[in-house]
Regions:
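Small-polar-interrupted transmembrane alpha-helices in polytopic inner-membrane proteins
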Residues: 114, 138-151, 206-221
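N-terminal targeting leaders of membrane proteins
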Residues: 7-124, 152-153, 159-180, 189-192, ...
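Interfacial segments of alpha-helical transmembrane regions
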Residues: 54, 58-60, 120-146
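N-terminal secretory signal peptides that target proteins for export/translocation
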Residues: 1-3
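Membrane-water interface at transmembrane helix exits
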Residues: 77, 81, 120-121, 147-155, ...
Length: 281
């Protein structure tokens, strides 16, 4: 991932630039939007330092959910292995590798799709397509970079090696995939993009489907034996928080631009002539 992500980001920038070259002001649009994207990354990464009392309840709920999952990791794993015939497990396994849908949890595929949306938005002049592509890319990068560092540093052993739920070898994850269980990656990546889209756009009846897709991708890593249930809880929650944060930033800018555009239109409106008639008796 260390080499793939920078390469894909470079493809995004170069592809956007090529599409922008044929449009007046295109390069300026790309420059401004990539600048906003960089600031969004920093904003998300320093978010833990802005936590206050209002966030305490959410943190407690998340902590309790993670603790419950962690204490039952081995029981959940045993139940999944012994109940593969149940409708619930069968449904989750529809998102497992090697089915193609699991690729929506991979950074390289999400960045590729994001680049395609962004370039298409530039080529067609669609701001919504550009925001969807860029926002998904930013949400994914803001999620996957720190998550990858945490996974490699914590060094939790994956369940498929059957040595128990609490086998940790700090730093070993930097050289061994087996010790990168916490937190889940596929689910965090897909959930970040899903949460961004839901926060930024009005998806209507599609909103539950988007969240269901991301959750299914995350849980499928549990049924696959690549992650513990608590890994999925942590990863999905992390992706959701990041995606909402990035989506909120995009939404604020869109609302501000809409307000300015409305004020400008009002200021440049054509003068109006009013004719009144008054009759006195």
């Amino acid at each position: 991932m260390a080499l793939r992500v920078p390469a894909l980001v470079l493809v995004l920038v170069l592809g956007a630039g090529r599409a922008a070259a044929g449009q007046g002001g295109g390069w300026e649009t790309v420059r401004e939007e990539l600048g906003d994207a960089a600031r969004d990354l920093v904003h998300v990464w320093v978010a833990p330092f802005r936590l206050g009392g209002d966030d305490l309840a959410s943190l407690v709920i998340l902590g309790e959910a993670f603790a419950i999952a962690a204490l039952n990791d081995e029981a959940i794993r045993a139940w999944v292995e012994g109940n593969g015939h149940t409708p619930a497990v069968k449904a989750i396994r529809l998102f497992e590798e090697p089915r193609r849908v699991h690729r929506l949890g991979l950074t390289r595929h999400l960045i590729g799709l994001s680049a395609g949306l962004y370039v298409a938005g530039l080529a067609t002049g669609s701001g919504d397509l550009r925001e969807a592509g860029l926002g998904c890319a930013v949400s994914n990068l803001a999620t996957t970079i720190p998550r990858s560092i945490v996974a490699r540093t914590v060094g939790r052993l994956r369940p498929r090696y059957r040595r128990g739920a609490f086998v940790f070898e700090p730093w070993v994850g930097w050289r061994s995939w087996a010790y990168r269980s916490f937190p889940v990656g596929h689910g965090a990546n897909s959930m970040a993009c899903a949460a961004f889209l839901v926060e930024r756009f009005d998806l209507g009846v599609a909103e539950p489907a988007v969240y269901l897709l991301a959750t299914g991708i995350g849980l499928a890593r549990v049924t696959k034996g690549a992650h513990w249930a608590s890994d999925a809880v942590a990863g999905l929650a992390w992706g959701w928080a990041v995606g909402r944060g990035v989506g909120g930033r995009f939404l604020e800018r869109a609302e501000a631009e809409g307000t300015l555009a409305g004020q400008a239109a009002e200021a440049h409106a054509a003068p109006r002539l009013y004719v009144g008639l008054r009759v006195e008796f």
